[in-house]
Amino acid sequence: DTDRSRGLGDVYKRQILKRFSATNNFDRDKRMEYLISYHNEICFYTYNDDVYFHEFTSDTIFRMNKRLEVKPVYVMGKGDKIPVPELRNEINQEAKFKKLIKFEYLMETDRHLLMMGNRWNKSAYIYDKQTGETIRLEDEQAVFTNDLNGFLPFWPIDRGRGEAKNEVWALIRPDQYMEGVEATGVNPLGFDLKFDDNPVIVIGTLK
C-alpha cells in the first residue's frame, strides 16, 4: 500500500499472505520452554523466480513459487545429525555439537547446491545436480581454485542474480591478499594492499 495520502507509518502495509505449518522435526519439551526460544530458524535463498527455504531441524528444502505453493525439492537425509532446539542456547560448544548438521546459508546455481554451516558445524556440502554426487568439506575450507591466474582459492559467500546466477563471489581481506602474494609470488592487482584498504572481491563462474 503506497498511497501517498497516508502517514509515513502506513506507507508499507504489512499483510500475512499465507500461513504454513512448521516442518521442524522435534517435540516441544514444556519443562524447557523458559530456557528455549522455539521460534523457527529458517534459511531462505532464491533461484530463478522461486524462493527456497529450509527450517532449523528439518532435513528438507522447500520451493515456493509466485502462487505461494510449496513443494519439497531436496531431502538431505541428516539422520541422527539433525540439530535439536535444546542445543541452541549452549555457548562455546561447537566441538561437542560438530557432528550435527545445521546450515546457516544456502545458494544454488544451475548445476550446484551449496549448503554451508557456520557457528554450529563449520563444514559445507556441495551437491552436483547433474551427477547426484555430494561432497563434504571440513571447516568450509577454500575449495574453489583460481584457474585464471593461479592466485588464492576462495569460498563463496553469495551468488549473482539474473544473467549472473551461475557466478559466485567472495571477499578477501587485505591481510589475506598480501599473505597470498607472499606465498604464491603472484600479485594480480599489481600493487600492495594496506591493512585498512577495502577487501578484494573475487568472482567465479560455476559450470
Where are these regions (language model features)?
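Conserved blade-ending motifs and adjacent loop-strand segments that build the rim/top face
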Residues: 73-97, 131-164, 178
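Short beta-strand elements that form the blades of beta-propeller/WD-repeat-like
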Residues: 6, 42-62, 101-120, 150-179, ...
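Loop-centered beta-sheet repeat module
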Residues: 14-68
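Internal helical hairpin/lid segments
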Residues: 97-147
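Beta-propeller blade signature
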Residues: 10-14, 124-133, 196-205
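Single conserved hydrophobic/aromatic residue that forms the stacking wall/gate
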Residues: 1-12
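C-terminal functional modules
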Residues: 171-206
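Short loop/turn segments immediately following beta-strands, especially the blade-tip
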Residues: 64-73, 134, 206-207
